[in-house]
Amino acid sequence: MSRIPITKEGEIILKERLTKLKFVDRPQISEAIAEARAHGDLKENAEYHAAKEQQGLTEAKINELEHALANAQVIDVRELPKTGKVVFGATIKLYNLDSDESISYRIVGNLESDPANGMISIDTPIGRGLIGKSIGDEVSIETPSGKLNFEIEEVEHI
């Protein structure tokens, strides 16, 4: 199986989520199940069934995070050579040539992608279109919503 790229910061966030699920959420759900059981007949006990469903969802999320972390290739961006080129983990400031606006993105793996917060996956059209480009390059990227034209203003490895 191929390794999934993730930044060092992304690994820390996923480990924190996993810890919370295992040591906060899981015990709370177990308590809720025990409390619901104490109410008697389980066939008609909505609290019990809701808690059991939540338990299943939580266990699935725990398994998903454990699998993701086991298959992650952690990349510390600060250790990469500073070439001025866009690489995995780099933070890029772009100037949109069409709208005259600047925007910043960080190129990350699928596990930590959060476009609303400027974290875009290396596997997206924008991510793929920027990799290997340098400061000053103008790039034209086809996206599902149309063509985007950018100039790369800054590339940081932070």
Kindly give the residue locations of the regions a language model identified.
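Residue-level signal for pocket-adjacent positions within structured domains
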Residues: 1, 16, 37, 43, ...
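Helix-rich terminal scaffold detector
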Residues: 1-63, 158
